[in-house]
Amino acid sequence: MIHLLPVAFAALLITTTAGAGDLILTEAGELPVILTAPHGGAEDVPDCAARTPAGKRFVNRPDQRTDLLARGIADELKQLTGKAPYLVMARFHRKFIDANRRADEAYGAPGCAAVYDAYHAAIRRYITEIRSKYPQAMLFDIHGQAAHPDSILRGTHHGTAVARLLARAGATAITGPDSVFGRFAASGYRIVPLNDTVPTDRVEARGYTGGYTVALYGSNHDDGIDAMQLEFGLELRARDVIAQTARDTAQAIAAFYTRYLK
């Protein structure tokens, strides 16, 4: 889809929610799939001071073009399946709010709270809606990383966030041919960890095992769903390949949906 990037930019400009949600793009879907993207935004947050380091791992740069990647995956999924996924995407800059952290680590001023709360309220609302409609569901948290620039990294907190999926379908749902990472590997992508390991073997890359979103909404919680963090290398988000990355990711998710969520 050569038109992917222009369509994505247009959607980011015109499709928003109200109030604090003006800084959050939300779209209800028809698939039992939620795409979240907390780190791709570029907008300032009124009355919210920029974050400052507090002695912990601190990043205030956006995950470049992950907003466009998430948008592209959603559009491609609609093309493939005839149904749209749910989408929650930050438009606010990470230097103000890191929505993939607990509230006490995510921002540094009271004026930021409304936007942070609205982002997570949207995710929770969609999870509640999906759980009322479908027996199984999956959340994919979209991120970017530079440590493995040509690779896609899996983060499930070593299987904890996909506990329900593992219990009903086994490790092949994470590493098998119709798993998302099985499809990535078959398409020629480098993946970390490799699919010759068991998800509970604690082999996910240090620092990329899954953040707050996956930990909070994963299926190890009674009110959660299966959740996985997808970390896309910088090279896979380059302007000349991001459309293909989105297409291949949507195809992988569609295959997973057909096998494990229908």
Spans of features found by a protein language model:
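Sec-dependent signal peptide recognition
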Residues: M1-A8
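Alpha-helical transmembrane-bundle signature of multi-pass membrane transport and export proteins
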Residues: A11-L13
